[in-house]
Amino acid sequence: MLEKFVAIGGNTIRTGGQVNAAEPKWQNAFPALAGEKETLIQLLNHDENDIDEAYIEDFNTLKRQIKDYLENSSNEDEYLFDSVELHRIQTYLGGKRKDRNNVEISGDYDLVKTLTDNVLESVYWLKDKGVHFDRSFVDMPVGALWRRGHKPMKAQGLEYIENLGDYVKHNHGRIFTETTAEKLIKEGNQVVGIEARKANGAKVKIHTRHGVVLATGGFGANTKMLQQYNTYWDNIPDDIKTTNSPAITGDGIRLGVQAGADIVGMGFSQMMPISDPKTGALFTGLIVTPSNFVFVNKEGQRFVNEFESRDVLSKAALEQKDGIFYIIADANIKALAMNTTEDKINQELEASFSATTC
């Protein structure tokens, strides 16, 4: 495994750590929250003509599941509903959008089905490799469409990197840090290795028997590349901040294109609606689930449904004065904040007060 930075982790180490996977037997033990029933009713009444033919059978299965749930649960005993079909349809609808040129994109059915059919198995696989998940609650990351998040016990993505890094080493794998991949080696149409360069300038050439996996995290920290391909956002400013690792600059995409690979959906980058407006850092302030916060603009007005997808939240935020909004929290909500500590919250409060009073 090649890693161009001094340590492995990439964007995973910067995430909230949640894995979205439908596990109804676990989720059904938790009560439904306000608004979830209404979301299901909206899906039940969604225009079938808006659904791609490949997804129709799953959509009709989901409608039957929702009808059964609504008929067999009362307000007193409503539980958190979920199914693989709900995950699949929400993945499809959540990823369906048009760009400024009226070009529509949506998830390839076979790929979405593979994801939603197998992601729970991946959670179990991660558990088998030593990742400990908090089973005391079902998480819902900002911009997710449903409560189905499996969250590791340790903050952010640390458990994945620690345990999977150890797994590679204990199974005779090798990790080369500060080693930048520069070119895929091809024989005919087959990729058989990779050329790389270490931080000291030394060249590295690795030959493989089973190809090369490009797991390089995209290009979210490369503003010029985002601007080059963008067809979705009205504007991506030169000075826009990012929650991404500075390593996420599109290296893998360039490697693939050089080797003749096709690209798809490059104009549709995702923006993260909540981050530090000065630094782009993700985990400052109080980050909690959408059921526990309200977004307000500088005028103190709520301006969006907090349960919406990240693109909807981001577009709504950019329409506010200076692109700034606030997450309203009280002491009870503070206790639910993720990926932070009491000391860190107090330090941020002190810094905020100092910045506004000096």
Where are these regions (language model features)?
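Glycine-rich FAD pyrophosphate-binding loop
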Residues: 1-15
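Short, glycine-/Ser/Thr-/acidic-enriched flexible segments
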Residues: 6-7, 19, 26-27, 182, ...
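Short, solvent-exposed loop/turn and secondary-structure capping segments
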Residues: 10-14, 25, 138, 218, ...
